[in-house]
From Swiss-Prot:
One of its GO terms (biological process) is trans-translation. The keyword RNA-binding applies. Residues 135-156 have a biased composition (Basic and acidic residues). It holds the Pfam family SmpB. Keywords: Cytoplasm, RNA-binding. One of its GO terms (cellular component) is cytosol. Required for rescue of stalled ribosomes mediated by trans-translation. Binds to transfer-messenger RNA (tmRNA), required for stable association of tmRNA with ribosomes. tmRNA and SmpB together mimic tRNA shape, replacing the anticodon stem-loop with SmpB. tmRNA is encoded by the ssrA gene; the 2 termini fold to resemble tRNA(Ala) and it encodes a 'tag peptide', a short internal open reading frame. During trans-translation Ala-aminoacylated tmRNA acts like a tRNA, entering the A-site of stalled ribosomes, displacing the stalled mRNA. This is SsrA-binding protein. It comes from Shewanella loihica (strain ATCC BAA-1088 / PV-4). Transmembrane segments: none annotated. InterPro entries: SmpB, SsrA-bd_prot, SsrA-bd_prot_CS. Residues 135-163 are annotated as: Disordered. Belongs to the SmpB family. It is found in: Cytoplasm.
Length: 163
């Protein structure tokens, strides 16, 4: 019998920030993991947790992907010789194949690229999970809310019936 040689990481990726509105406003068909091109003061601020992804999105320009609208608040002890811009556009590090796929779907079929979460990979690399999806209509959001409430109600009745 063949032995599986798969290494399982003991520590799951530590989440830094989540875009909670993303799953409510969009239906994602595919998710990607992208690296971020950051400056030193940004990494220090991220370690403290001063990141906000709520109003951010990803746009494609000149064949490259950029994170726009993500706020990384600089620390008070940040470097004095570097201008700290908390709202600057940050380049995403993706493979050419992934960039081409994203470019084609966004231009032709009207998909949106939205950041879902930011997390640490191997305690050294900041990664951004981005989702490729379409915006939900109002009735889709209501259906999701009804379904979620029905699951809660069903679990309550099963819990009380078991007593």
């Amino acid at each position: 019998m063949a032995k599986k040689n798969a290494k399982k990481s003991k520590n799951p990726p530590a989440t830094i920030a989540r875009n909670k509105r993303a799953n409510f406003d969009y239906k994602f068909e595919e998710k990607f993991e992208a690296g971020l091109s950051l400056m030193g003061w940004e990494v220090k601020s991220i370690r403290v947790g001063k990141v906000n992804l709520s109003e951010s999105y990803v746009f494609l320009r000149d064949g490259e992907a950029y994170l726009f609208g993500c706020t990384i608040t600089p620390l008070n002890t940040a470097s004095t010789h570097v201008v700290c811009d908390p709202m600057r556009d940050r380049k995403l590090l993706l493979n050419r194949r992934e960039l081409d796929k994203l470019q084609g779907l966004v231009e032709r079929q009207g998909y949106s690229i939205v950041p879902i979460s930011m997390y640490w990979r191997k305690n050294a690399w900041v990664k951004l999970e981005i989702g490729l999806g379409k915006g939900k209509k109002e009735h889709d959001k209501r259906d999701d809310t009804k379904e979620r409430e029905w699951k809660i109600e069903k679990s309550r009745t099963m819990k009380h019936a078991a007593r």
